[in-house]
Amino acid sequence: MGKNYKLFIKEEFKMIVAALSILLTSYVSATGGGSFYNPKLGGDLSYHKVRLLEYNGAGAGTWLFRTNLPAVNGSFAYDTLVSYMQQRSIEANVSFPNITTQGVKLVDISLLSVNSYSDIQIEKDFFEGNPDKGIFYNWPIVGSLVSPNWLSEAERIKEVAALNSSIDNLPSLIPKIRNAVLSDVPPSKPTMIFFHCEAGSDRTGQVAGSYMMQYHGYTAKQAYEWDNEVAQRQIASMSQNGLLFYCWWLTYQQGYKNLDCMNYSIASDIEIPIII
């Protein structure tokens, strides 16, 4: 009876933490942030936040970007977004299609939660009205109130093993993005896959940093420092925690070595690898 009661309390605590995470994300979006989670939200689409992560030249080509909310003055910024993607590709010496003759297909992965309904609706309305321009997906990311580095190793291993049942479910999302870039069926139209939150810093950084650790050899510190450079500040604690949970998932569940999840924020000069 005592054991079952403790298990019940533990599961109830997890549910409370998950609910608080969603509520805190809602508070941030509504107020512009607090002392615990303080992103610079919104604003128009920023060239600084548009970054090329991956390119696959098979077929008509597939590009992967991270961005902030792809809107200007409350409207979906299609032309601006594509022009920023083109310029980032040129900077990386990566080919880019002739937009006039070939056009592009956008695959928009929004990381926003339901509390950002109006921003989600901007994107949904655009793609519903312009189905030839691409497709929209919504995969809400909230991060974690708890850092895995606060836990004992035994507890951390247990929590990490259940990561695919978390709200974010990065063990499912990150490979899905990778598989979309390296599809067995090369696209017949140039395809621009991109993911974003509001500011393109915190939740976007959590996903982007996780992707770079899994597929581009970044350590936890390199992923964290790169995210901070894009954000032009430290990414939010909840997003740091989400990034670290995935770091430990790669370590315990996938056998990755030398990610150094525990020492990700120790001050030192590091070199961030060139992505492309």
Q: At which residue positions do the language-model features occur?
A:
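Cys-dependent protein tyrosine phosphatase-like superfamily
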Residues: 2-10, 14, 26-194, 198-199, ...
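Sec-dependent signal peptide recognition
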Residues: 13-21
